[in-house]
Amino acid sequence: MPDYTCERCLKEFSQKSHYDKHMNRKTPCQNNKKTLEKVVENIITNKIEPKKSEITLKNTITETDHASPKIEIATKNGEKTQQIVKGDCIEGMKKIKDDSVDIVICDPPYNIGKDFGNNSDRQKMDDYLVWCDEWIAECIRILKPAGTLYIYGFSEILAFIRVRININVRWIIWHYTNKVTPSLNFWQRTHESILCCYKEKPVFNKDDVREPYTETFLKNAAGKVRKATKGRFSNGEKETTYTAHANGALPRDVIKISALAGGAGKRERVDHPTQKPLELCAKLIKASKNGADTVLVVPFAGSGSECVAAKKHNINFIGYEINEDYVKLCNDRLSEVEVEVEVEVE
């Protein structure tokens, strides 16, 4: 009697009908094949010399040993660690110490067929999610308990990723009004989603990212007294006076910032298909920054926007990028950055 084996989970079936039913089910089976291949690969790797990888540090190519002790990204002798690493982010992050990074901002390929030069952005969804599991696991491992991990994406793709993340998650919307999808026959896309992930109570600098008040609030509510009402959030018999904060309203989870499209992004735009605005990158960094020694990791450096924003705010960062042209683009942009001097208001 012939045996039928699932190439993905390696489960064996004696009857073809059972095998067909297994292969056609909606929920994908566990990918034991890749797990087994990794085990074999690790066994082989431990028997040969450690591999070398190229690192681009301030436009200088050096070599780093994969077997070297885990590194800690920090300010050393008054100098910030600010570098772009040419190489795979998963392998790169494996070298970073556990619980040592304040902010991780991920703008991965969305698996929608974008051209990034030397890598494919079109995989089977199962393979794409398995790959996402790998880099997200490293991001979570290196993240401090009070740190924040941000992941960009379209909602319909991030929904699959979100359920696989085992720490706290909030949804943020980046809403842009100056860019729409070219289709005229369906809902026009005017937003991207951001997963905001954290282990424990995260650092959140609300006063650094306050937003302008709406005209409605300033006209109808500011300075007025509201009497107590019954309900879940009742404050008893107290009355509340609404006052406008000098720096604006508390930040909301819908961020309204223009995309780099048309005239709005002409001065900032570079040759990269998914470049994010510096204003957006800076907002995420300022919201989660944890003092002068803040450490940011950018697994997919791409156009370098997150790294440029980090350098402007004078924090430590490492960005990973596999495309040599984009490594050069990042370093070119970083070479033109002037650090912004922060003035503390007493």
Model-derived features with residue positions:
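DnaQ-like (DEDDh/DEDDy) 3′-5′ exonuclease domain used for proofreading
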Residues: 55, 59-77
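C-terminal recognition-helix end and immediately following basic linker
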Residues: 1-40
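Intrinsically disordered, low-complexity regulatory regions of eukaryotic transcription factors
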Residues: 35-58
